[in-house]
Amino acid sequence: MRLRDDGSVPDDNPFVGRAGYRPEIYSLGHRNQLGLTLHPDTGALWLHENGPLGGDEINLIRAGGNYGWPVVSYSREYSGPRVAFRTWQEGMEPAEIVWLPSIAPSGMVFYDGDRFPNWRGSLFVGALRTGMIRNTGHL
């Protein structure tokens, strides 16, 4: 969903005027998105999602992108079977990072400080399941 500060829909939202879609939609095919951050240099929007049983994802969000849930997934249902029978499909955006088993991502931030220059541009992701902060490296 993408809105202006006053709640109105930007004219350049990717689904404005498309039959069968609400104009507020910016991207679709998400399951349980809990964390968003902007890349400090590019301004790109990054999102993390929790899968039901593994298949947690980091996604680079593109206008109008379809991220596949539940058609494509690395996840399993809590009862055991796979959510989907494929992990990729043409026309759907692949995840940048997938965790198996689940780490239960709980927030993320790009490091853009000066104290640790080797970490500049690295994405750090909090993990509820392991109690760790994971460095994904430079993205």
What are these regions (language model features)?
Residues 1-139:
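Beta-propeller domain segments
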